[in-house]
């Protein structure tokens, strides 16, 4: 996962805006986690409507007030704001555990093209190794809430068991008949391919077609 941000700086959305400026720091922050790439902009009405839902989703999975142990989840805000001031204003009330790219980093645009983002808001969910689980994260978060995290986690386990201890792999019971459907829905695509999901919409209000 760290290779996606190789040579880049990620910033923590805390009061000090601590920088993760080495590959080791980025790796420690992202390793063995599902990573949400959140493409949004403060001036986008659809983003403003979605953000409270996303914040609640993230906090309920990572804040010890709600859970005994924070979920293996990280979020990187990939700003599509027009100015750095708009980006700062948008992040002001966002969770402090969020990460974001510096405004001057062109990777903000490159990631939009790489993952075929066509409208805002968009949430691309990545496995710990950088493979794509789904590009429809925003829709699933709105429909399913925190329950979709368990779906994503299970889909990641299908391939690499990143969320299980070695002893958990022994004597496992057969999975349900619906597993094949989940595998199909959450088919793994190499992040470098940047292909489109079937049925992915475009050209709607809030579209990001001109941003990338």
From Swiss-Prot:
UniProt key word Calcium: no
GO molecular function: receptor ligand activity
Family membership: Belongs to the nucleoredoxin family.
Subcellular location: Cell projection, Cilium, Photoreceptor outer segment
Functional description taken from the UniProt entry: Plays an important role in retinal cone photoreceptor survival. In association with glucose transporter SLC16A1/GLUT1 and BSG, promotes retinal cone survival by enhancing aerobic glycolysis and accelerating the entry of glucose into photoreceptors. May play a role in cone cell viability, slowing down cone degeneration, does not seem to play a role in degenerating rods.
Name the UniProt record assigns to this protein: Nucleoredoxin-like protein 1
Limits of the Thioredoxin domain: 1-164
Ranges for region Disordered: 191-212
A GO CC term assigned to this protein in UniProt: photoreceptor outer segment
BP-aspect Gene Ontology terms: photoreceptor cell maintenance
Assembly mode: Interacts with isoform 1 of BSG.
Entry superkingdom: Eukaryota
Main location: other
The entry's keywords: Cell projection
Pfam families: Thioredoxin_8
Gene: NXNL1
NAD as UniProt keyword: no
InterPro entries, sorted: RdCVF, Thioredoxin-like_fold, Thioredoxin-like_sf, Thioredoxin_domain
Ranges of Gly residues composition bias in the record: 197-212
CDD domains: TryX_like_RdCVF (cd03008)
